[in-house]
Structures are given as C-alpha cells and as structure tokens.
C-alpha cells in the first residue's frame, strides 16, 4: 500500500481543518501569490501610488497587453499578484460592485466598502465545497475623503497599510519601505520610492517592465504614469541603489496569520 502523508486527508477538501487549525488549500493559494510578480503600494499625504513588476517572458509579447494595474472606478485602482486569471475575476467583480453602488446611491463607492465585498467573496471560497480559494492577492488603492491602501489576502482577510508589497519580492520591498517611508511624503516622492523598491527586486529593471499608476487627492482620478516618467524615476532609483546598501531583511512579511 502506498504511503499517504498525514495531511493528505485535509488537502482534499477546502472545508476541512487540519488538527492544528489550518486550511491547507488557503495556504497553497498564498504560495501562488508568493510566486507571483511583485506589486507595491505607497500612500502619501496627497495621494496613493501603485506599481507592479511586469514579467514579459518573450520579446514577441506586446508589453501594453500585459496589464497588472486595473482601474476599478474613477477614484479606485487595484494591482494584482498571483494567478492573473483569478485576479481578473476579482477585478471584474469589484467593477460591478462599484457600478451598483454608484447607481444605487448616486455617489462613488467608499474603498472600505468595496474591499469588504471583495474579501467576503474570497472568504466564501474558503468555506464551501466545489470551489477553491482565489490564488491572487490584490492591492486596492483609492481616494474618497483621504488616500487609502489595502491588501487583500486569499483567505478573505484584509489590512490597511501606509506602504506594502505582495508577490515574490515582498520581503525586500518591505525592508526598503521600513527604512525609507515617511508620512509627509509627496506624491512624486512616493512614486520614486515605489520604483526604487521594484528596481531592487528586478534583475534587469526597465521602463517597459514597470507599470505605475497614481490617484491624487486633488483630482481623485486614476492616472497611469507615462513610460518617460517611469524612466526618469528609474534612473534616479538606480543611482540611489548604487550609492547605498539596501537594509537587510529583519522581518518576514510573507504570511500574516491574523486569521487565527
């Protein structure tokens, strides 16, 4: 008889807890996020920034078709890491919920309301048979009364951050944020910090492999940064990387067990 690992029985159904209180399928979904391209978000006094690493695996791929930052509403955006197809389903649901709220109440949806709805959907996919957890995490950013930045976990948990990263480069980016983030940063400084974090993670950073979007407090409108602006920020970031050592990783941010 073939040997069956002790945890195998708990792997076969999403609704079954292991004896130590874990849902293995949720943990595997988190592993999919850890393998994904890095996405970062930075909140500042006059807006919020999202930036992502675009892993273009072939020179034949049109970089513009490889979208990793999505506009949800005029004032809300999302960046993804993990399984792109799963992220697209979550983004489509977020867009639908934003439209329903606007038609129902005649005003833009608050980001906190939208984040909760998306995380409720994620949580449902950890509780019912016949489904699996979403193998994607989202950074959701927006401006209603003030800039806000949330991370959504495959488990359905969500956290608000000043600066955060998801994906394979999370620990390195978080170490940079811990060292360099300031509450009084301007939007321009936040863009540079986000690009700096990605440039340290990527082997060959280029303007074509970094996507950046911002939402400012003044305009409350989603806007993607042009490749020329990204190139300028990247040039400054690479000079800074050469000039100083990046701090060592002191803390592991790869998994937040606030669910237990």
Swiss-Prot record:
Component of the proteasome core, a large protease complex with broad specificity involved in protein degradation. The keyword Cytoplasm applies. GO terms for molecular function: threonine-type endopeptidase activity. The formation of the proteasomal ATPase PAN-20S proteasome complex, via the docking of the C-termini of PAN into the intersubunit pockets in the alpha-rings, triggers opening of the gate for substrate entry. Interconversion between the open-gate and close-gate conformations leads to a dynamic regulation of the 20S proteasome proteolysis activity. Keywords: Cytoplasm, Proteasome. The 20S proteasome core is composed of 14 alpha and 14 beta subunits that assemble into four stacked heptameric rings, resulting in a barrel-shaped structure. The two inner rings, each composed of seven catalytic beta subunits, are sandwiched by two outer rings, each composed of seven alpha subunits. The catalytic chamber with the active sites is on the inside of the barrel. Has a gated structure, the ends of the cylinder being occluded by the N-termini of the alpha-subunits. Is capped at one or both ends by the proteasome regulatory ATPase, PAN. Residues 241-260 are annotated as: Disordered. Gene3D superfamilies: Glutamine Phosphoribosylpyrophosphate, subunit 1, domain 1. Residues 242-260 have a biased composition (Acidic residues). The gene is psmA. This is Proteasome subunit alpha.
């Amino acid at each position: 008889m073939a040997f069956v690992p002790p945890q195998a029985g708990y792997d076969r159904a999403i609704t079954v807890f292991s004896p130590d209180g874990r849902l293995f399928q949720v943990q595997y979904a988190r592993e999919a996020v850890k393998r994904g391209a890095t996405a970062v978000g930075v909140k500042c006094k006059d807006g919020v920034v999202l930036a992502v690493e675009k892993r273009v695996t072939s020179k034949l791929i049109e970089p513009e078709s490889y979208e990793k930052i999505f506009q949800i509403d005029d004032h809300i955006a999302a960046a993804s890491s993990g399984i792109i197809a799963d992220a697209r389903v979550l983004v489509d649901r977020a867009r639908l919920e934003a439209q329903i709220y606007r038609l129902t109440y005649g005003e833009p949806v608050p980001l906190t309301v939208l984040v909760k709805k998306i995380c409720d959907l994620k949580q449902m996919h950890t509780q019912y048979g016949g489904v699996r957890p979403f193998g994607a995490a989202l950074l959701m950013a927006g401006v209603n009364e003030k800039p806000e930045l949330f991370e959504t976990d495959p488990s359905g948990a969500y956290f608000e951050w000043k600066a955060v990263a998801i994906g394979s480069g999370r620990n390195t980016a978080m170490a940079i944020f811990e060292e360099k983030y300031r509450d009084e940063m301007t939007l321009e400084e936040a863009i540079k910090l986000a690009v700096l974090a990605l440039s340290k993670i990527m082997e060959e950073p280029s303007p074509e492999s970094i996507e950046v979007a911002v939402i400012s407090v003044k305009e409350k409108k989603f806007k993607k940064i042009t490749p020329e602006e990204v190139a300028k920020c990247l040039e400054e970031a690479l000079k800074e990387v050469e000039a100083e050592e990046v701090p060592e990783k002191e803390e592991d941010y790869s998994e937040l067990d606030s669910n237990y």
